[in-house]
């Protein structure tokens, strides 16, 4: 899918645990301006969301497994990949693409974004998780959704 990039993350493990770099400024043309972390229980879907002003996102699953789904709103093309413990990669999503993720397991998820969130002027828009272009990409048919994502469902 044009513009979407997989960024392999090198994980260093020993008897103490592991260490991984999840962001380097040199990976991107635009600087990441905010970092967010969420915890999601197995079966949660967050999204699909998009930003009309073109915010870019980098998604990294810090613990557990997440299924990332991206929808090109112009072409209808889709991208999906399971990331996390077994597949330590970051997924870079350029602006104006709808994106979301499903918690395949309980997970800790990190978002790096190119715009700071402004609660007075949020650039947050939704595509239903069960939109015909993406509904078959999820592993669950009865996800746990936020009120916002429930209202967006078709």
Please describe what each predicted stretch is:
Residues 1-89, 108-154:
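Non-catalytic, conserved peripheral segments adjacent to functional cores
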Residues 86-105:
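Conserved SET/PR-domain catalytic core that frames the SAM/AdoMet-binding pocket
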């Amino acid at each position: 899918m044009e513009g979407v990039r997989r960024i392999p993350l090198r994980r260093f493990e020993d008897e103490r645990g592991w260490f991984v770099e999840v962001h380097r400024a040199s990976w991107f043309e635009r600087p990441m301006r905010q970092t967010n972390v969420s915890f999601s229980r197995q079966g949660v879907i967050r999204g699909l969301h998009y930003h009309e002003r073109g915010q870019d996102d980098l998604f990294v699953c810090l613990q557990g497994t997440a299924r990332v789904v991206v929808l090109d709103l112009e072409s209808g093309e889709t991208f999906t990949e399971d990331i996390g413990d077994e597949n330590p990669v970051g997924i870079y999503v350029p602006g104006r693409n709808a994106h979301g993720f499903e918690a395949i397991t309980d997970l800790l998820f990190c978002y790096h974004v190119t715009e700071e969130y402004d609660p007075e002027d949020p650039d947050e828009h939704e595509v239903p998780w069960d939109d015909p272009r993406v509904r078959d990409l999820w592993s669950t048919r009865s996800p746990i959704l936020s009120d916002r994502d429930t209202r967006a469902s078709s």
